[in-house]
Amino acid sequence: MERLVFCVLVFGALAKAQLCPGRCICQTISPTLTLLCAKTGLLFVPPTVDRKTVELRLTDNFITAVRRKDFLNMTSLVHLTLSRNTISQIAPHAFMGLKSLRALHMDGNRLSVINSDQLKGLMNLRHLILGNNQIHHIEESSFDEFVATIEDLDLSYNNLRTLPWEAIARMTNINTLTLDHNLIDHIGVGTFTLLTKLVRLDMTSNRLQTLPPDTLFQHAQVLSEPKTSSSSRLTVSFGGNPLHCNCELLWLRRLTREDDLETCASPEHLMDKYFWSIQEEEFICEPPLITKHQVTKPYVMEGQGVTLKCKAMGDPDPAIHWRFPDGKLVHNNSRTILYDNGTLDILITTLKDSGAFNCVASNAAGIATAAVHVHMIPLPLLVNNTGHMREADPGLSDISTSSRSSSNDSKTHSKRVLVENLTAHSAVIHWPSERHIPGIRMYQIQYELCVLAVYDDGITSLTATRVVGCVHFHTLPETNQCRFVPSQFLGGTMIIIIGGIIVASVLVFIIILMIRYKAYSGGGGDTAKAKAGGDVSVHVHSQTNGSRSAATKQSEEPPESPAGKHCKALVLLKMVLPILHLLF
């Protein structure tokens, strides 16, 4: 019997020894279990940790990551310390299930980003220590799990430029907020209004130039260096910031001071002066002054884009916004883009944009406005032969857009424009005269061989364009060009050719002299008369006169009716622009 009891005790001791990792200290003080594994050279969280552990300390090791399985089912864990390791990664939901955890210490690691899913499950967390890391970004919802329970938040000695201020503003139970030695340059207005239990706010050694006034600071004690303070009064530490001493910090100057160690960094006349020694009258601001307001182009065609610019100066730097001609405030959307430097881009203009845009510059000292005028040019409306408004025909406005026409449009207009007499260098194009369109000034032929009628619109007095038709064709293959003379024909052959040319020239000169001699000797012969005949045509480059055929010989045929009259153009394809022969 005694031997059986001894065996049971031995097996129990061995079982407990297996649950405690090597080189770790396991302390069992009923009903709690504490596991201490400091400076043991751990590379990861030991998998043999008792799942009923209440306090787990793994400080001064070489753990590089927190895995999802490391703290699985450890629902009794209350205090977790992972300080001074080399942790750079936290797996998503790595702390899920730790509903009893009250304190998490991860200072002195290599964390760079805190994502929203890395701290999930810590619904009862009260102390979060993340100081001495390399954190430069914290997602907005990272603290949402414990925003109502957190009491101590330490983010000191990181690379933070901003914080999830909206989440911090909801931490109504927080007592200590430590944000010193970061790169923070802005604090949202009203961030601390609801933090009535806040006892200590440490903003030492950041890049703050100003602090927003807050009702919570009315009874605050201001310190330039962290010191002990009573629990009943808020202590604000802001030493080591490049304070800009203007009217925005006048509220801080009126608070109770404890020493004269803090100085101003700007403006220039207050540089290096003790903050608390400056008179209240010297904390002044300058109203905004608009130095530049202009538009890239004052006249804008409807649908085009335009850029408006506005610059202003003042102390503090004024914020710039714009108002439409109807007085509405301009916001960023798919049509308008407003930049921080005061530039406004309108990507697509409408007729409602015609008028005066107002640039408004404002700061703590006042408001300044300036008007920028934009004149909208409406798109031309086409008129049919009945005098009623109609939509413009979808067509090409210039050569560069000719390739954008759809195949359906090409098929529709190809029946109205015909091509004939195709050669390697030219083609003759026929199209209707379009006499029913009033005021046609010319016909424009483009590289895609689409004929456009350009005329004056009767209502808007603007130039309108209508596609008469398009045609597609292929020219005939070009004949072979002259080949280069082989080298064997040069030399003596060239001398013979040159000599022949000289002899021929002498013979021609002799024949001319003989003809002149006979002409003078004939005396009184009939004078030869030249008779001009044949068709005369004029080359016109790129565009033709649609109203009349100038510089052409009038035909003796009877005139045709206007409805049946056709136009014709000869296109010389070797030219950079088409050369047209107008035949009416």
Curated annotation (Swiss-Prot):
Compartments (UniProt record): Membrane; Synapse
Cytoplasmic side stretches: 516-584
Organism, as annotated: Danio rerio (Zebrafish)
Lineage of source species: Eukaryota, Metazoa, Chordata, Craniata, Vertebrata
Name the UniProt record assigns to this protein: Leucine-rich repeat and fibronectin type III domain-containing protein 1
Composition bias type Polar residues, residue spans: 540-553
Record domain LRRNT: where: 18-51
Entry function: Involved in the regulation of excitatory synapses.
Gene3D superfamilies, sorted: Immunoglobulins, Ribonuclease Inhibitor
Region (Disordered) location: 393-414, 539-564
LRR repeats by residue range: 52-73, 76-97, 100-121, 124-145, 149-170, 173-194, 197-218
